[in-house]
Curated annotation (Swiss-Prot):
<dbReference type="Pfam" id="PF02107">
    <property type="entry name" value="FlgH"/>
</dbReference>
<protein>
    <recommendedName>
        <fullName>Flagellar L-ring protein</fullName>
    </recommendedName>
</protein>
<keyword id="KW-0564">Palmitate</keyword>
<dbReference type="GO" id="GO:0071973">
    <property type="term" value="P:bacterial-type flagellum-dependent cell motility"/>
</dbReference>
<keyword id="KW-0472">Membrane</keyword>
<dbReference type="GO" id="GO:0009427">
    <property type="term" value="C:bacterial-type flagellum basal body, distal rod, L ring"/>
</dbReference>
<feature type="lipid moiety-binding region" description="N-palmitoyl cysteine">
    <location>
        <position position="15"/>
    </location>
</feature>
<dbReference type="GO" id="GO:0009279">
    <property type="term" value="C:cell outer membrane"/>
</dbReference>
<keyword id="KW-0449">Lipoprotein</keyword>
<keyword id="KW-0975">Bacterial flagellum</keyword>
<dbReference type="GO" id="GO:0003774">
    <property type="term" value="F:cytoskeletal motor activity"/>
</dbReference>
<keyword id="KW-0998">Cell outer membrane</keyword>
<dbReference type="InterPro" id="IPR000527">
    <property type="entry name" value="Flag_Lring"/>
</dbReference>
<feature type="lipid moiety-binding region" description="S-diacylglycerol cysteine">
    <location>
        <position position="15"/>
    </location>
</feature>
<comment type="subunit">
    <text>The basal body constitutes a major portion of the flagellar organelle and consists of four rings (L,P,S, and M) mounted on a central rod.</text>
</comment>
<feature type="signal peptide">
    <location>
        <begin position="1"/>
        <end position="14"/>
    </location>
</feature>
<comment type="similarity">
    <text>Belongs to the FlgH family.</text>
</comment>
Amino acid sequence: MKALALLAVLLLSGCASIYSTPPTAIHQPMSARPDMRAQAVPATGSIYQPSQARPLFEDRRARNVGDIITINLVERNTAQKSANASATRGSAITGGISLTAPNIASLANAKLNGLQADVGLDSDFSGEGAAAANNVFNGTISVTVIDVYPNGNLLVSGEKMVAINQGNEFIRFSGVINPTTVTAANTVQSTQVADARIEYRGSGFIDESNTMGWLQRFFVAIAPF
C-alpha cells in the first residue's frame, strides 16, 4: 500500500505544470492604480485648474503614481577575475642506532648492528582559478510609477511577458528615477536609474531542461567529493 502511495505521488509530480511564473527578486507591485484626483472646483474661466496641474511650457511627463515611463535598457557589464595559489612544505627526520645483543647469540640473526631509521614528508599544493563575464541587455520596457518619494524621486516597476512557442519569457524592471532625467519623450536610460533590478527569466520545458532535478540536487549536496 505504501509503495502504491509513493508511486501515485511521483506520477502526480510528473503531471505538474512547468509553465508557472518564475520567481522574482522584486518584492513591490508590478503596477499601481493612480491616486484619486482632487475634486474639481467650479470653472472660473481661469486657464489654471488645481485638480489638473501641469506646467504650461513642458511636455507631459510621468510625475504621479500610476503614470507610465518607458525605460531604454542599455546594460553592458564586463568583469574579470583570476587567482593563483601555491604552497610547498617538506620535512625529514634521520636517526641511527647501533645495537649488539650477545645474550641471545643462539638465535639466528639476533645480532642487531647499525639499526637506522629515516622518515621524510613532502607536501605540495598548487591552485589556479579564473572567471570572466560579459553581459549585454538591450531593449525597452514601460513601467508604472509605484510611489513618489518626498524629494520627488519616482519608484517604478513593471513587467513584460512574451509567449513564444512552448514557453513564456518574462522581463521585469524596478528602480528609482530622478524626474530630471526623464526626456521630453517620457523615456529614461536604464543606466540613470538608481537601485535598478533587471530580470530576464523564462518558464517552460526549455527552461526546465536547464535546471537540475530535485533528486540530483540532493545527491550533489551530500556527496563528499
